[in-house]
Swiss-Prot record:
Induction: Suppressed by retinoic acid. RAR-selective retinoid is more effective than RXR-selective retinoid. The gene is SPRR3. Its main location: cytoplasm. It comes from Oryctolagus cuniculus. Residues 80-94, 214-231 have a biased composition (Polar residues). Suprabasal layers of the squamous epithelia of esophagus, tongue and oral mucosa. This is Small proline-rich protein 3.
């Protein structure tokens, strides 16, 4: 066995370090360079449902039909040439300290102290002790079919310049203790067919300047004379 080992030639193992050191000295191969292309990226095109958060200093122009509701105490200074046309039927509820300048044709509903015009067929029945004191120059024209039934103790004191024009077919039935005190220059002209039935204790005190127009050809029938003629 020893003789066999001595006959084999000794071959040293290859040194890889020396081979690696020699590689930089060799010239690089002359091959065509092919760049590696990646998938196209589109960062500026938002996908559906993407939310874009604007950075500081970004100006966004609102589209047509955008509605902006200012907070309380918010002051908005419109630019020059800015025109806002409200749509028909638009209702604006201003906040505290907000000024509204109505446009031509604007209708404003007045607050307390406005004048109310009663409709036809109105019936006014005042209670006991109810006083109506009209102002100077006040004219009351009752409509057709209006019935006024004053209660007991109802005083009517017309002011100077007060004119009352009763309509045809108006019936006034005063209660007990009803007093009518006309003022100077008060003129009462009864219409045709007007019936006045005074109650018991009804005094009529005409004042100076009071004019009473009687109907033509009044007929007075006493019960005593008619019974004697029939006998």
């Amino acid at each position: 066995m020893s003789s066999y080992q001595q006959k084999q030639p000794f071959t040293p193992p290859p040194q890889p370090q020396q081979h690696q050191v020699k590689q930089p000295c060799q010239p690089p191969p002359q091959d065509t360079f092919v760049p590696i292309t990646k998938d196209p990226c589109h960062p500026n095109v938002p996908s559906p449902g993407n939310t874009n958060i604007a950075e500081q200093g970004y100006v966004k122009i609102p589209e047509q039909g955008s509605i902006k509701v200012p907070d309380t105490g918010y002051t908005k200074i419109p630019d020059s040439g800015n025109t806002k046309v409200p749509e028909s039927g638009c209702t604006s509820v201003p906040g505290s300290g907000y000024s509204v300048v109505p446009q031509p044709g604007y209708t404003k509903v007045p607050d307390q102290g406005y004048t109310k015009v009663p409709e036809s067929g109105c019936t006014s029945v005042p209670g006991s002790g109810y006083s109506v004191v009209p102002q100077p120059g006040y004219t009351k024209v009752p409509e057709s079919g209006c019935t006024s039934v004053p209660g007991p103790g109802y005083p009517t004191v017309p002011q100077p310049g007060y004119t009352k024009v009763p309509e045809s077919g108006c019936t006034s039935v005063p209660g007990s203790g009803y007093s009518v005190i006309p003022q100077p220059s008060y003129t009462k002209v009864p219409e045709s067919g007007c019936t006045s039935v005074p109650g018991p204790g009804y005094p009529t005190v005409p004042q100076p300047g009071y004019t009473k127009v009687q109907e033509p050809n009044p007929s007075i029938v006493t019960p005593g004379l008619s019974q004697k003629k029939t006998k």
